[in-house]
From Swiss-Prot:
Belongs to the complex I subunit 1 family. Keywords: Electron transport, Membrane, Mitochondrion, Mitochondrion inner membrane, NAD, Respiratory chain, Translocase, Transmembrane, Transmembrane helix, Transport, Ubiquinone. It comes from the Eukaryota. GO terms for molecular function: NADH dehydrogenase (ubiquinone) activity. GO terms for cellular component: mitochondrial inner membrane. This is NADH-ubiquinone oxidoreductase chain 1. It catalyses: a ubiquinone + NADH + 5 H(+)(in) = a ubiquinol + NAD(+) + 4 H(+)(out). It is a multi-pass membrane protein. It comes from Pongo abelii. One of its GO terms (biological process) is mitochondrial respiratory chain complex I assembly.
């Protein structure tokens, strides 16, 4: 039974990811006053499957000077980690109920850095290596902010278990008392997933295509699949942490439906931001984190630690 659940989860994620790619192309098309994909199937709905068929049936070319083992392992590792991160998410019942679910997600997501660094180094290309170094510096930097924001939220929920966040938000969303944290979290997830306006790793005018420059066919598709799976995951996590849905034991379907709708709306916002904002300069990207987000999150973390200590002597006001 657990194997069937796992396969169903993976299939659902992969289908959602395929249609997210199509939705992005449609949204970008409409914002640029054109139609987007509309040839394959009705309204272009079969475009993702046509793309997958094309990419996975092409010959995967490998640069003659590349380190073959790492070159092949990197894209597979990226997608494996992206799918692994879904296992502790309660929707409403998690596949694996971990007491340290949030810590697991934070730790496992940081492993994505290895797949990016390996792919850039193993390609033996200057463009790919510079793109990989940029991506690693950016990802590691913004993970600091994500960790501090998570700590602040955990001080309110009192547990690393993701299911505890559902109980914490039974009466009101954590978005309301901690909206500055939510705003910084959302911007940090944009940077963490290398999305516009933080897609410095793919600076076409400077780096051709970033760390995946030398990839083609199947391995190239795996990187894209990992990126879009991570986007959906980050928005699902944002929904769970700041826009918690009340779980009614008599209608678990309602929880799943509301959770999915909120995640889809946040994902649409990701795509809207991509079609609207230009790319940051690299120094602006780093200054935003180290000079703005880090001091702010540290101050808010100290606030969330000090308020419960300062008010611990006050009796319950019932």
């Amino acid at each position: 039974m657990p194997m069937i659940n796992l396969l169903l989860l993976i299939m659902s994620i992969l289908i959602a990811m395929a249609f997210l790619m199509l939705t992005e192309r449609k949204i970008l098309g409409h914002t640029q006053l054109r139609k987007g994909p509309n040839i394959v199937g009705p309204y272009g709905l079969l475009q993702p499957f046509a793309d997958a068929l094309k990419l996975f049936t092409k010959e995967p070319l490998k640069p003659s000077t590349s380190t073959i083992t790492l070159y092949i392992i990197s894209p597979a590792l990226a997608l494996t980690i992206a799918l692994l991160l879904w296992t502790p998410l309660p929707m409403p019942i998690p596949l694996i109920n971990l007491n340290l679910g949030l810590l697991f997600i934070l730790a496992a997501s940081s492993l994505t850095v290895y797949s990016i660094l390996w792919s850039g180094w193993a390609s033996n290309s200057n463009y790919a290596l510079i793109g990989a170094l940029r991506a690693v510096a950016q990802t590691i930097s913004y993970e600091i902010t994500l960790a501090l924001i998570l700590l602040s939220v955990l001080l309110m929920s009192g547990s690393f278990n993701l299911s505890a966040l559902i109980t914490t938000q039974e009466h009101s969303w954590l978005l309301l008392p901690s909206w500055p944290l939510a705003l910084m979290w959302f911007i940090s997830t944009l940077a963490e997933t290398n999305r516009a306006p933080f897609d410095l790793t793919e600076g076409e005018s400077e780096l051709v295509s970033g760390f995946n420059t030398e990839y083609a066919a199947g391995p190239f598709a795996l990187f894209f699949m990992a990126e879009y799976t991570n986007i959906i995951l980050m928005n699902a996590l944002t929904t769970m942490i700041f826009l918690g849905t009340t779980f009614n034991i008599h209608s678990p379907e309602l929880y799943t439906t509301l959770f999915t709708i909120k995640t889809l709306l946040l994902t649409s916002l990701f795509l809207w931001i991509r079609s609207t904002y230009p790319r940051f300069r690299y120094d602006q990207l780093m200054h935003l984190l180290w000079k703005n987000f880090l001091p702010l999150t540290l101050a808010l973390l100290m606030w969330h630690i000090s308020v419960p200590i300062a008010t611990s002597g006050i009796p319950p006001q019932t």
